[in-house]
From Swiss-Prot:
Sequence motif DEAD box, residues: 373-376
Amino acids binding ATP: A263, K264, T265, G266, S267, G268, K269, T270
Biased composition (Low complexity): 44-55, 683-697
InterPro entries, sorted: DEAD/DEAH_box_helicase_dom, Helicase_ATP-bd, Helicase_C-like, P-loop_NTPase, RNA-helicase_DEAD-box_CS, RNA_helicase_DEAD_Q_motif
Domain Helicase ATP-binding: 250-425
Catalytic EC class: hydrolase
Biased composition (Polar residues): 14-26, 744-753
Gene Ontology CC: one annotated term: nucleus
Enzyme Commission numbers on file: 3.6.4.13
Domain note: The Q motif is unique to and characteristic of the DEAD box family of RNA helicases and controls ATP binding and hydrolysis.
Protein name: DEAD-box ATP-dependent RNA helicase 24
Ranges of biased composition (kind: Acidic residues): 34-43
Region (Disordered) location: 1-106, 604-640, 683-704, 729-770
Amino acid sequence: MSKRPKLGGFSIPRPTSYSFERSQPPQRLYVPADDPDLDDIAFSDDAAAPSDAPPAGGGGAAGDEEEIDPLDAFMAEIQEEIRAPPPAPKPEALRRADSDDEDDPVESFLRAKKDSGLALAADAMHAGYDSDEEVYAAAKAVDAGMMEYDSDDNPIVVDKKKIEPIPPLDHSTIEYEPFNKDFYEEKPSVSGMSEQEVADYMKSLAIRVSGFDVPRPIKSFADCGFPVQLMNAIAKQGYEKPTTIQCQALPIVLSGRDIIGIAKTGSGKTAAFVLPMIVHIMDQPELEKEEGPIGVVCAPTRELAHQIYLEAKKFAKPYNLRVAAVYGGVSKFDQFKELKAGCEIVIATPGRLIDLLKMKALKMFRATYLVLDEADRMFDLGFEPQIRSIVGQIRPDRQTLLFSATMPYKVERLAREILTDPIRVTVGQVGSANEDIKQVVNVLPSDAEKMPWLLEKLPGMIDDGDVLVFAAKKARVDEIESQLNQRGFRIAALHGDKDQASRMETLQKFKSGVYHVLVATDVAARGLDIKSIKTVVNFDIAKEMDMHIHRIGRTGRAGDKDGTAYTLITQKEVRFAGELVHCLIAAGQDVPNELMDLAMKDGRFRANRDSRKGGKKSGKGKGGGGGGGGGSGARGRGRGVRGVDFGLGIGYNAESGSVPAPRSAALNSLKTGMMQNFKSSFVSASSSNTPSNSAPSRGAPSSFVRPALRGFVSGGTIGGDANQARAVLPAPSFVPASRPAENTVENANPNPESSRDRTRERKRPSGWDR
């Protein structure tokens, strides 16, 4: 049987004989000497076939049928598959199992984004910076970083990549036009006040001011000397008299001074910098083509930026000043065109302003008035490098205003670097709740009791004004909206899943009265200024006390004292109950017994409270520590740290309602008081106080008396009453070491009163001096 060579993967039949008529032998240019076989084809020696036999492959030989052409076999398999019936469908369970085993490309992509900290960034791309915590985390992931996720799949920002800053300008190479920033002249009603009257007026406003050459506070807008057009705009907006922060901030800013304004939320800070900005801009030449802005305001959230934008437009309209709002969620191209056309005032979030500065949409050569509003919140969101980058684009002799509800170290450090000789104005207690807001706390058994409570109280709340309800999660917001909608309430929802257009539409309808109830996450907690809100309901408690303060600050805005804030707290939220007690006390509010009982379940709160009490038993005029009082007439009143007051005024008095001093301050005062008492009890040895050889009688004369040593028990003394002098033995004097002194009355100092005035000479410093 002949063999078939494999050429190119196909079987080629070989003829048994060659004939020149049928086949030409292969032509070769070179034939090796050791290869007599010209066509390199192996032959079988015993193969015999007639010369005219037909070629193999025609189907005649039985041996040829044993080998199958691979191409034919492949095509035959395809035909069989085509003719075969379709396979029966798999059961649903098997299909689901197979699907779970497969790696879905979309799912893998989303998982990879989440692992890298960008799972929520797609919805917040170029959306600015929100006050909703979930959206904040997503937006910051675009500009800044990596996230981790808690058990509820909430993002936690743990690291941020640096936003590429804009190189600061070399202002020494730029020739700036001079400008004026002092427009204030005291009216006789202000300059005529005496120093005592000014001090009393500032005390009534609860204002604390520090700085050089501070202008006096005003009593009305007329004292500012505003133009007639601006005064008409102020009256049109319903402003009757300035708020506390405005009374002191307006004359300072109009005088051209830099200011650090620290005031509680809802105090009217916006008008305190918008009104002087109008005067500042109108004094400068008009903008040329591609110039501007003159006034720049930076805010941490798009809601606050939009709110400032609306407020600024009201006062800029009489002067035809152009105001631009620059924040995320809006077309960047439209904002680019608006800035290119020119505007005098820009209200922006730091991230979007940096983007537009890189796009050359605006130039800062004419900017002379810079405002940083809610500076503490901007630092919380990690905007410090962006703020510094923006400040580096503005001329150094600008006027800079910084407003904040709190003053952390980072904000303090920035203020020292970018402000020039600032005046610091503090209104009320830093970081405290608005005392004008009535706070009501309801302790409920569980979350299931919250909705019935809200349905019962809500109609009465709506009669007083608009209602803002805060919930902790977006799902809870949707649930409350659905429940209230079913019962006919005109309600709207606001949270991080809403796009910017729907948020603006919802807020506009809420302001215009289409909706009477707005339920929201913390997206609305900062900067939302709606004067029609009379009631705030904390349906869920805030994650931290600072956010709680800003939540309830949405009512009682700009001096309105009609606001009420309700907080619903359950039995499981004992930790927050203790913090809420401190907040209520600091704001001068009543603390319900139910809330105090709940707070006492918290070990930390209970330990701190017991330490201020100093134990349960009161002293009865005996020395030593541990008593809650001590001494006659002082049973348990003076409450110091761990039951001691040391006569230094550092204890907590329950009747005065004062806030207890920090532990560090108490210990420092304790140390100082003990050292003073220690030093005053000893005198140095000298020739003038020679020991006497005679012992005084037990009935000591009246000249040998000293007051009891104060301070080692709250309200008490060492060995007796502080208000009653005791006859005691004279203090022993110190003698040289070569002559040991015996602890007898013969070694007593006969003149203790004169020797007490002299300082003891120590050979080495004591431990208290180190």
